[in-house]
Structures are given as C-alpha cells and as structure tokens.
C-alpha cells in the first residue's frame, strides 16, 4: 500500500536544501501531539527541520505487513516473527529530485491495530506525525533514544539521494519508548552527509 502527496508548484531545479535535525524536535512533536487537527496539519517535523512549508514538499509513504526478523525483534523487544507494520517514507523539496532522507519505521501491529487508520498509508501524511498517531491508541512516548553512525553509502542510497562521489551518509536509529517501557516505534533514517546538520542541545540544571 502506498500513497504520494504533491503540494505546491511543479518540480523544477534549485539548490540542495539543508536539513538541521535537533534533539529538541521530539519535545516539540509531543507538545503538538494532542493539539487540534488544524494546528497539527499546519506544519510538521520536516518543515521544522528545513524551514520549508507544507506546500513546498512532495511526500510518499508505503506500508507493508511484515514479520520481525532477528534485528527488528531485538530493536523492538519482541519475539522473532511478531507481526509489524513497516512504513517507508520519502519526502523531497519540490525543487529537487532527491528525497531529504530515506526512512523506514516499524510499529508492532498489535499495539496499533485498534485504530485501522494507522494501518492505511492513504492516511499519510498524518498531522502531528508518529507521536500523534500513537496517541490515538493511548500510547504516550516517554523518551526517544537515538544512535547515529556514519558510513559510505550503498549504491542504491547514493543513487536515490543523488550523492556526490565520496559523500558519506549518517545512519540514525531511533527508538521511541512509551511510559510503560515498551519500544513503540523503531526507525532507521539514512541522511545525506552533504546536506544534513545534527544539532544536540543538553539542558543543564542550574546551581
């Protein structure tokens, strides 16, 4: 199952768009997860990271019914063979041919099946993103754990992201953990090294 949403003018040519990812985006998302649909739909995480508007973006999503292999079972803390919802996302700036990143995300089917809309790619892009989706089935995200590594791209990644020769990719693996300690979403994001900036802000307690 897949869906693609194109907003704004037709594709043209323009400069590569910088994506600035900050760890503060997660609290920003949570603050909006229970807001009204109009507020949630006005802007999303991609717009937050790029400074673009909703109308600047071309969005594509695919959903698949899959079973957990050893890697996914370990990441989601479930048994091998557990039924999952695999979600593949590509979002690009309408002036560029390559997506901003390559994302694959996994939800445990049993956790979200009570809301059929969460199994339907045609409902994407979901206003408010994953935290808002999870909120509809009574799940509150307590913390987000992220691990970032760098490596050379595969041939497929280099082609799809239109990477210049010698450019590395950043691989971000993210686990969303709920208030009961369950991993409720695990995702892997492949970020192009030539146009991604990671910003980490740590709030310190005052003396």
Model region roles, listed by residue range:
Residues 63-65, 90, 175:
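Residue-level recognition of beta-strand microenvironments
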Residues 85-86, 97:
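N-terminal leader/targeting helix
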Residues 74, 87-92:
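Internal active-site segments that recognize and position negatively charged phosphoryl groups
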Residues 1-83, 112-125, 129-132, 140-142, ...:
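HTH-adjacent hinge/linker in prokaryotic transcriptional regulators
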Residues 78-80, 92-98, 103-207:
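C-terminal regulatory/effector modules of DNA-binding transcriptional regulators
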């Amino acid at each position: 199952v897949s869906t693609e949403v194109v907003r704004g003018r037709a594709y043209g040519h323009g400069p590569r768009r910088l994506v600035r990812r900050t760890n503060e985006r997660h609290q920003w998302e949570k603050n909006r997860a229970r807001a009204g649909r109009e507020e949630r739909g006005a802007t999303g995480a991609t717009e937050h990271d790029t400074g673009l508007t909703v109308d600047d973006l071309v969005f594509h999503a695919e959903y698949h019914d899959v079973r957990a292999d050893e890697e996914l079972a370990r990441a989601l803390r479930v048994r091998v063979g557990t039924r999952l919802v695999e979600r593949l996302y590509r979002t690009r700036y309408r002036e560029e041919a390559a997506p901003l990143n390559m994302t694959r995300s996994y939800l445990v089917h049993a956790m979200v099946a009570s809301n059929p809309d969460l199994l339907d790619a045609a409902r994407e892009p979901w206003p408010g993103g994953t935290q808002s989706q999870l909120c509809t089935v009574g799940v509150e995200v307590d913390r987000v754990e992220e691990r970032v590594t760098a490596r050379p791209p595969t041939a497929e990644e280099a082609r799809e992201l239109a990477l210049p020769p010698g450019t590395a990719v950043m691989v971000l693996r993210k686990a969303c953990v709920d208030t009961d300690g369950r991993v409720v979403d695990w995702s892997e994001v492949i970020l192009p090294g030539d146009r991604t900036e990671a910003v980490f802000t740590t709030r310190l307690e005052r003396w």
